[in-house]
């Protein structure tokens, strides 16, 4: 495979022109509502300045980056004319990639990287529908349906993409091999190789990102601490807290921060290195609130405990 990075800076004149158009539009919007706070207040609290500050400092630069990258992407597709375009997400510039593939008549396939389950109430519907805009309801012509839960989701939230029932393509697959399991345990947790191993693998999100179907950082910590208290009372059991690699988790919490917030105990250890496949292979049970790891475990016939100490959400019923 050839990796072609998309630069964030194109021709200076083009970039300045696009930035000026956006800035002018934002200024007009702000001025048009200068005497009308109806849309920018709640219970007599005005948040207009906060909104426009967010637009100028965060949204506008992101839009400029996507605009620049889409320009290069357009040129790249015109030059290379690929036979097919395959992506695992449709967020940001990858959404533009799906649109351009339709524009140029290039077949495109979305293979979602995340878990999707059928919404069970109005709150889950709001968040899973939003989540689906990057993975299930996208501009890509074809959609790989990798699990029965994804299919059930699409029955409630239809997509314009043509569905292809593929089974798991991106999910982790492990060997049912006792010797390999033993060797991995000796390598990863030699002092607990003979214990019952629980692997906690969940996906916390920031407070602004789907705060119902995923754990907020504070809930993530509370749920793990609750588990630690339980595991401490059971002999010959060890809890592995599997965290995402640093480049992912730094968006929400660093390993050092999590370590500082957890109860001190010898019954658990924190791991962020190595592949999830290895940890799934050594687990007697996966523990999670909401994550693709739940589906990956079930696909590999590893028992799963869906754990929410508050009892508000159940990922798969």
Positions of the model-derived regions?
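Structural motif
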Residues: 83-84, 142, 196, 238, ...
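Anion (oxyanion) recognition and catalysis
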Residues: 102-103, 232-233, 298
